[in-house]
Amino acid sequence: MVVGVVWLPLEAHPRPTHMSVNKTAAEAEAGMTLAEVREEILRDYRICVMSREASLLGRKEVLGGKAKFGIFGDGKELAQVAMAKQFRPGDWRSGYYRDMTFMFAIGELTVQQWFAQLYAHADPAAEPASAGRQMNGHFATRSLDEHGNWRNLTEQYNSSPDISPTAGQMPRLLGLAQASRVFRQNTALHAHTHLSDQGNEVAFGTIGDASTSEGHFWETMNAAGVLQVPLAMSVWDDGWGISVSKEHQTTKGSISTLLQGFQKEEGTNGIRIYRTKGWDYAHLNKTYEAAIALCREEHVPCLIHVEEVTQPQGHSTSGSHERYKSPELLEWYKEYDCNVKFRQWILGFKPGGEAIATAAELDAIEQEAKADVRAAQKAAWAAYQNEIKAERDEALGLIEAVDPAIAAELKAEMNPGRKEILSAARRALVLNAGAPAANDLHAWTERALEENRERYGSHLYSESAQTCLNVPEVSVEYAPDAEMVDGRLIIRDNFAALFEKEPLLLTFGEDTGKIGDVNQGMEGMQARFGELRVSDTGIREATILGQGIGMALRGLRPVAEIQYLDYLLYCLQGLSDDLATVHWRTRGGQKCPLIIRTRGHRLEGVWHSGSPMGMILNSVRGVVVCVPRNMQQAAGMYNTLLQADDPALVIECLNGYRSKERMPANLGEFTVPIGIPEVVREGNDITLVSYGSTFTICARAAERLQDLGIDVELIDARTLLPFDRTHRIAESLQKTNRLLVVDEDVPGGASAYIMQQVLEEQNGYHWLDAAPATLTAKPHRPAYGTDGDYFSKPSIEDVVEKVIAVVRE
């Protein structure tokens, strides 16, 4: 059964590269000639067989040793061609590693590029999705020009960058769809025509049926039904999750049946649910045309459950599905193979009483596709190998002059990679240090290592002119009679200034809207700027993050609020796997300048006093991490970040909202430099480094220590990623010769990270006359209450005693 399917006029959604869905002869007369119908059907068939040939040949290339791993879209071709017909310029995809046919069909992936990714060709010209950084089947388009500026996203087909974790694509899909709602309903944004055509874009999502068991899927679909955003979710249902059948995956064995409670009815929100077969060309086309029309025009989310999809080659090159699938099922795969069924349908389709194609014509298409795929594979392999062979030949001459035996080993390698070349060069240098010819080889090796650091490691953070590192510092200003106010008022009024001057800015989270967040940092903002820009969400951190990622990918400036730092764990997977890697895994092809606002460190209770900074730091490289000591510093960081294009996490101090601070005069203007610590108190006896809420403890301890004759140099790290770019802490050590790092993470957490940065990166150990020390929270979680806090986290007395111990060593 297909729910709510209606026919639409042929001309309703014209596409520049594909015509509308095929009709009967009578319907074709109204909008398409039979010749055009025939042309479209045969083009679709060619895409399907070309994609299948790529999958088959790709598997052979992996098993033959030319590539490391292969995962393919065979069996899903026909549904993806039908979906592609409804995909317009400006639309967005958030899918997964089976979608090769779709990418071929919209013209954003060539077969040669597909093979280039299979071989890990680390050149964005050859492999524009990830420049060889991702395994095959991970697709993306390029949203940025060579300077890191937005292209016109409404004139191109857009795909967000795929990740491997199952259902990991779901949260960002929600944000991609919500952006259309924002662009449609906020008329102030209608002038941003390079980002949206007044919200007429659909966000297309795809997922394998087994992955619908993941929480991300349910959280996203529920939120989409609440928000009413143009999200079109396709489920490719082949009945398996690797070796586990859907009887063990899904209640009642059907995701569309299970979702019936989500069904949108008259006068309600929810989603529209459609069901179709992966081998039924005509029905697929009808279903997608109806579903996407409703989604695009009325912003009603939909789910298209594509059943009876096959998997001819099994899950991937990792193993054989013959181990766990029955012979009967494998025979059924052959009978209901979508390409086989499509061929049968074409031969039986006679709109004018005559078949639109003969078996011989289809045979010719298949042979041509096979030849074209083979040619593309050869071209991709040659392009990939030619670069490396040139590097090998250059290295061989230099290695031979130093160590002929190692050179001979390298020459004997079949299809060596850069690893083998550099490994040989470095071995030769180690074994022949001091050889006359070693200098030339050393110079070549250093140059090659630097080139490969760039080739595989660039763009972890923004490298554009808009990087946060380039935002000029603007000092905070105070009126002579500046009022002492609660810190929350500085945050509130600073955000108000930012909302006034930046129409792309919006914020959302649990309790963010109506009450202005649980600490009143957004008090009155929803009434002032509207529910579209300052909104509440459900309790669903993974998709709060996803909303931010998706909207930031589309050029909006979202501030996603996670109510407490302790709850960041609910969205840490997306923060680590998706947000932190966007810029790197596209080699600068996309950016995601999302700001995550949260609050943490000491307050009351096990799950309202967390400071798991080591866990965060080791999970989110690629994200700027700011740890302000007060609300003026936090406001300055927001002012900096909103002028930049890096993703960032700002952790406000939970116990700072009621602390009194002077109200700045230049709200929305003053900035805090990223990666530059601040020496808040100068001293000569010891360098004390801290951040966040613990910094206040250290400041009070420093006053007591002064009375004891110990002169503390107190430094606020301010940001942990990046950390002390100017080596200000090492400079302090040259004067004090002693170091203590204080925080409220567990032992070996962020304090150990800071110590590594100071001692190893900054060579701070040169200046020490005493062993460097850390003072941290206890290994257990913070206990409840004032006494629990005192005996769980560093106190003023702890800091004083630790400083005395270090100074007296």
Feature roles, as predicted:
Residues Y281-P301, E361, R585, G589-G600, ...:
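Phosphate/diphosphate-binding loops
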Residues P9-L10, P16-A79, K85-Q86, P312-F529, ...:
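Conserved acidic/glycine
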Residues E53-S234, G239-G241, S245-Q263, T268, ...:
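Cofactor-binding active-site loop characterized by glycine-rich and histidine/acidic residues
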Residues G95-Y97, A167, T206-I207, S234-D237, ...:
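Short beta-strand segments
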